[in-house]
Amino acid sequence: MSNYHIKHLEEYYQVYRKSVREPENFWEEIAEEHFVWRKKWDTVLNWDFLKPEVKWFEGAQLNITENCIDRHLTTRGDKTAILFEPNNPDEEAQHISYKELYKKVNKFANVLKQEGIKKGDRVCIYLPMIPELAISVLACARIGAIHSVVFAGFSAAALATRINDSECKMVITADGSFRGAKTIDLKGIVDEALKSCSCVKTVLVAKRIMTDINMTDGLDKWLAPLLYNASDECAAEIMDAEDPLFILYTSGSTGMPKGMVHTTAGYMVYTAYTFKNAFQYKENDVYWCTADIGWITGHSYIVYGPLANGATTVMFEGVPSYPDYGRFWDIVQKHKVNQFYTAPTAIRALAKQGSDLIDNYNLSSLKVLGSVGEPINEEAWHWYNDNIGKKKSPIIDTWWQTETGGIMITPIPYVTPTKPTYATLPFIGIQPCLMDENNNELKGNQVEGRLCIKYPWPSIARTIWGNHKRYKETYFSAFENKYFTGDGALRDEVGYYRITGRVDDVIIVSGHNLGTAPIEDAINEHPAVAESAIVGFPHDIKGSALYGYITLKGVGESRDQDNVRKEINQLITDRIGPIAKLDKIQFTSGLPKTRSGKIMRRILRKIACNETNQLGDTSTLLNPEVVKEIIDNALLK
């Protein structure tokens, strides 16, 4: 029996039992047999959730790019590593082999070194989904620089916050990006961000849209000529197991985004192992994750996980609706995609178009369908199963987080019987538990509580960059000696897990975690706004959308309310990005508050969801009369 590739349910239970009874022996075996090390570890695991501190494979030395590229050169050198599908279907796809990837990454790594980037330096990457994005990530890892990828839909203000927090010395960007029918001025956004960033010494600019842009002497450099002149050989920097690999920012329920730090060895082992099993990846399969590398899904399951397994990974620059809603299926047919991993928000948008369009495409290559970003609702699950999988391709509803680094709870296709809306069973080595509000573990089945993890896994984020205190407070203070996920979950009669949603002030919109505090901060900058509260409400496509309750100052009450709404959404776009715009804005004379002055978001959430019969006792509020006003004027269409 190979612990590395699980093929049936009995084997899953055997391997799972071993992984939780002897976790150190289990992960040592996986690490030893399936990866390349410059030096083996002294200890497999040191951990203490009270500090909190987690260290895997301490004493080991390696470079993750040797595991993702170099070791494949003799056996898979000519195999396609990255298959790039451009935004415009008339533009030819690019097949980058492992040999070519090796040369491209080395050239890029040499450019970074030439520009003064050293091991431990932070590099911000603000690029569209073009090959340079994956290559620059790997080039940083090649020389031991810490990459910080920022999704290229974030605003200049959001980009500047992230650059400053990790003190990036370099930004890698492009002249612009294509997104469906739109062209986005990425370089202009970087220029705006850098007005408030003194740490950046160099900006490397890739050409994508080929338009004239502003280039600042001494700061901005075109990437192409530097790559052309660089050597295609670059020795990999030897890294310690616990050296940081990357920082990735995720929304917090309070203002500042959290720079999650992932380290080298444990992250590599866990993402590779989860990729192999969660997608039942086999040699010569073509795998496609539709996420952006700006999110953790793209880091783990477009770049590192697939390449560590010598896979062919598809990178798609565009959107599912351009030039029409058949684009995903056109790509599946064209490249004979075997594993397809997308978000419920995309599935719902495609389902809305009906199934006639799908009949034009041959989807018979599909073996596994994946879902990520939020729990998939039942209607979308059945549509995906019936129309895309033709009831033959299992759906893996994967639950995990930026903080976890890799998939945590998921069915294994052709192994775990699936159940709509359920993430089903914990992945190998993962020990989930459900807790009540009094810090008691809920044992047995048919229970619901707060989802925690009892024992460390190799790819857990080690800290928040520059703020270990916040890391402890956020993840390890709610429940003693356990990692708290921030999610609620239930365990059914057979032990399957279903994620019931966030229990903090984070709303998942189109699969993206949005903290309410930063959005409210942006709104409250408007001169006409006195106070605001943001809640989520169900949305057919996005899963959740944002509903804003806003009280105006005297100056705002006399203004045209539609104009104020537009200005508020523009402020949000400028501060955070268009992803955080409000779908509904209701102006109200006040917000319901406790006598201590706390806004009762629970009540506002119920009103936004049209559940006003479940408000409970509002008589203890400081201002109960405002609840009736809000209900009477609620925007429920």
What do these predicted ranges mean?
Residues T65, I82-L138, S155-A160, M215-A224, ...:
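Conserved AMP-binding/adenylate-forming core of the ANL superfamily
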Residues D78-T80, L204-V205, T216-Y249, M256, ...:
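Conserved pre-ATP/AMP-binding loop-to-beta segment of ANL
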Residues P89-D90, M170-A241, Q353-G354:
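ANL superfamily adenylate-forming
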Residues V150-G176, V190, Q333, F340, ...:
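AMP-binding/adenylate-forming catalytic core of the ANL superfamily
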Residues T202-K207, I541, D574-I599, N613-K637:
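AMP-binding/adenylate-forming catalytic domain of the ANL superfamily
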Residues M268-V286, I296-Q339, K352-Q353:
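Conserved AMP-binding/adenylation subdomain of ANL enzymes
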Residues Y304, A308-A311, N338-T342, A351-P420, ...:
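Gly/Ser/Thr-rich phosphate-binding loop
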Residues L425-G429, N440-Y475, L514-T516, E611-N613:
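Conserved ATP/PPi-binding loop(s) of AMP-dependent carboxylate-activating enzymes
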